[in-house]
A protein has these predicted regions:
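Activity-critical C-terminal alpha-helical subdomain
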Residues: 281-331
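C-terminal substrate-recognition/cap domain of FAD-linked oxidoreductases
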Residues: 75, 83-262, 266, 270
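FAD-binding subdomain of flavoenzyme oxidoreductases
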Residues: 1-101, 329-331
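Short, well-ordered loop/turn and helix-capping segments at boundaries between secondary-structure elements
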Residues: 46, 60, 88-91, 163, ...
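Conserved, structured C-terminal
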Residues: 1-3, 122-123, 323
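Short beta-alpha connecting loops at secondary-structure transitions
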Residues: 70-72, 198, 283-289
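A short, flexible low-complexity segment enriched in Lys/Arg and Gly/Pro that occurs
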Residues: 15-34, 80, 215, 249-258, ...
């Protein structure tokens, strides 16, 4: 989830699993590592109920030390310098933040309103420093772990961010973000009552290609008049990061479906992955073969034939396993 930059994604936390499948039970062992052929855990993770029903899982656990958690936020003059700072942080090998989120200019302007920054002394200082609306970018996050570790990582974060033109804006913005982190999404239901639709699509790419992906996908979304497009990264690695594209616009269901497909086409043509962690499901299935390749998709289908020869588990297009050829959207 939101702490994956330090702890890893959900699949990185799995030690063992147990599934019930039409051909029998599948169990793996809860040891930290093994080398006994291809990893069955990884074969099953992400299968979205198409290979079996997950009935038990053993996960890694970590020490809970909230008293040591330290918060930070920085404002950058623009997106390129903010991305350069994020890249240097993840590649610095001095430790990683737990929550690590970087918003592009449009999302930053919305965040200043949502988190109560607009009109505060922080906002005034940012403006005096020449950080302009429509250009400035907000980075926020937390560091978890031993007290000495969290203090050291925060010091290094400050050093890197300042070297890229970032201004430290305290941990107060992060606290504001935490306060609304799990309630803000519920605005979607209220807005739908007025015909305003919100959706989130996410992808992943490497650092060199990230600016191109951001520009390409955002350009398509903004080509529709009166459409808000907020973008952020929140799962970062030494090699690259994910990008979340959140769009808000007034449209009906038919127009939404067509627009949504266009965004996925833009993600595919940008060279990014079709998903970083949301999964493929049925909605994104038409793009899967174009993402991973025909031979690679046949591996999934071979596993499906083994575990579920009668196709009773989650049929109807999940993972493109029984998707009609005419429904494929290839690059």
């Amino acid at each position: 989830g939101q702490n994956s930059t330090y702890y890893g994604k959900a699949e990185d936390l799995v030690l063992s699993q147990e599934y019930i499948t039409p051909v029998g039970d599948i169990r793996t062992v809860d040891v930290p590592a093994y080398a006994t052929g291809p990893n069955i855990d990884q074969m099953m993770i992400g299968s979205e109920g198409a290979f079996g029903i997950l009935v038990a899982v053993t996960l890694k656990v970590f020490r809970h030390q909230p008293e040591n958690t330290t918060r930070f936020s920085f404002i950058f003059p623009d997106w390129p310098r903010a991305c350069a700072a994020a890249r240097e942080i993840t590649q610095g090998e001095f430790g990683l933040p737990s929550v690590f989120r970087l918003s592009d200019p449009e999302e930053t302007d919305v965040a200043f309103k949502l988190y109560g920054v607009e009109g505060t002394p922080i906002d005034s200082i940012v403006s005096l420093r020449g950080f302009k609306k429509g250009e400035r970018c907000l980075m926020l996050g937390t560091v978890d772990g031993d007290r000495a570790y969290t203090s050291m990582v925060k010091r290094r974060l400050k050093r890197v961010c300042r070297a890229h033109g970032g201004m430290y804006s305290t941990g107060l913005i992060t606290k504001k973000w935490e306060h609304g982190r799990f309630t803000d999404p519920y605005m979607r239901e209220d807005l739908q009552d007025y015909g305003v639709l919100i959706d989130t699509l996410e992808c992943a790419t490497n650092w060199d290609d990230l600016p191109k992906v951001h520009e390409h996908v955002r350009a398509f979304i903004k080509s529709r008049p009166k459409t808000v497009c907020m973008t952020h990264m929140s799962h970062c690695y030494p090699q690259g990061a994910n990008l979340y594209f959140i769009f808000i616009a007034k449209m009906d269901a038919e127009e939404f479906h067509e627009f949504h497909q266009g965004i996925l086409d833009a993600v595919q043509s940008s060279g990014a992955t079709m998903s970083h962690h949301h999964g493929i499901g049925k909605m994104t299935a038409p793009w899967l073969e174009g993402q991973i390749g025909k031979n690679e998709l046949e591996v999934f289908r071979a596993l499906k034939r083994h575990f579920d020869p009668k196709n009773v588990l989650n049929p109807g297009g999940t993972l493109a396993l029984d998707l009609p050829d005419d429904d494929r959207r290839l690059p």
